[in-house]
Amino acid sequence: MNFYSPPTLMELARQCLLRDEYLAISALKDLPNMMFPVMFKEAFIDGHTKILTAMIPVWPFPYLSVGTMLKNLNLDTLKAVLEEIDILISKPVFSSRCKLREITLSHDLVVVWAGSHEVEGLPEFMEQEKPVENSPGYGTKNKLKVTTELQFMEGHLDECSTYLLQWAYQREDSIHLHCRKLKIYGLTKAAVIEMFKIVHAEYIEDLELSCLCLEYLDFLNPYLKQMSNLLSLTLDEIIYTLNIDDYRNLNEEKVITVISHLPTFHHLQELYVHGVIFIECLRCLKKPLEVLSFTDCDLSQSDLDYLPYCLNIFELRSLHLTDVRLSNLLLEPLGFLLERVRHTLKSLQLMSCEMGETHFNALLPALSQCYQLTVVNFYGNELSLLFLKKLLHHTAKLSQLADELYPAPQECYDNRDVVLSHRLENFCSELLDILRAIREPKKVTFGTIKCSKCGGSYVYDLETQCCFFEKNPPWA
């Protein structure tokens, strides 16, 4: 039975104000602080532009995040927000109520704004931390900080990003543009040079480089050296060269030379590598990584042998290998690596790595010692029912596991690789019993190989305890 919960007095007051634009704007000077965040969000969603922009000059908290509401950002909305910022910074003296120091325009960067949960936590956001000398932002305390993210697609910014950069450049005496996340998918050198005249590289914390050739990576190197506070780096499909003739003459030594010239990132915590010769990238790191992710990389035996001795990965929290062919390699070094990170590792993903029972046998002794693991993903590898039982006897001892993904047993397929769903249901029920005998599993899923036509998979999970077809499984 559903019970109707009447709106609170605060909700009624907010609804009343939003229905009367003039009343809402005139009431802002006396509006309780706790009403600002929710009222701002509702005004934004309902398109009350005048109310929205009138709130910015009297915003009573240090932070204002509009990025989470700008999923479909258009130029008109951006201009409306920036026009009110212009009004704010043009005033010789800010409103006594205005505490605004930072506006966040990033889509996926969540900045908590005080008052978002009624009055809880207000004091901690009402105080400004004193800037530390030589730290990012020092010397800019009198400027309004505008935080954003930028994305280059084939050498071009979208119209909103272009407008924002031009706007910030014209107001550099009063606005500090802070780009925390930068994505570059292909580039033109001229555009990058112009961008870095406005964007301060030392404030970039998250960098994604995709579909670039090595010569462009070499061109970016001076800017990379300025990224002294980089926390996350993604290298995706860094190709050797755009010139076919150069490609014929290119050897591995030249590739290694370029990559080895990458700067030392002293604060890097996360490295994501897709389709790149990655071992040389690890030599560019100073601070121990927390996340190491390889996707679609060619891994040699010498690469694998080197990993356990890499000093930068002994504090790993996440180790993810996806579509990395391991079938022709000896995995004892990977087992040695797991043993060395057993006290810190929380997430282990070995997905679609062409691993068989021999490969997993090399890892089981070390895997059994990784007691901090909360997530394991072994989907996409070929394992028999008998071996899956052996594997689950080991993972059953890992009491912290909260999310487990395993491949369906090979006995669930006929000789044409057609899934026999009744077998999947029977076998997976047996496998779950192994876990239940030792601990109470939280989330366990078994999945078949994805269909070559639709990309779907048959799934058996702990929640439903039945076999069903999922057209777009999140892991496939």
Curated annotation (Swiss-Prot):
What is the recorded name of this protein? Oogenesin-2
Q: Which family does it belong to?
A: Belongs to the PRAME family.
Instruction: Tell me what organism the protein belongs to.
Output: Mus musculus (Mouse)
Its tissue distribution reads: Expressed in ovary, specifically in oocytes. Detected in follicles with two layers of granulosa cells, and are present in early as well as large antral follicles.
Superkingdom of origin: Eukaryota
Key words, A-Z: Leucine-rich repeat, Repeat
Q: Which residues form the signal peptide?
A: none
LRR repeats: from-to residues: 97-121, 176-200, 201-226, 227-264, 265-285, 286-317, 342-369, 370-394
Keyword set includes Repeat: yes
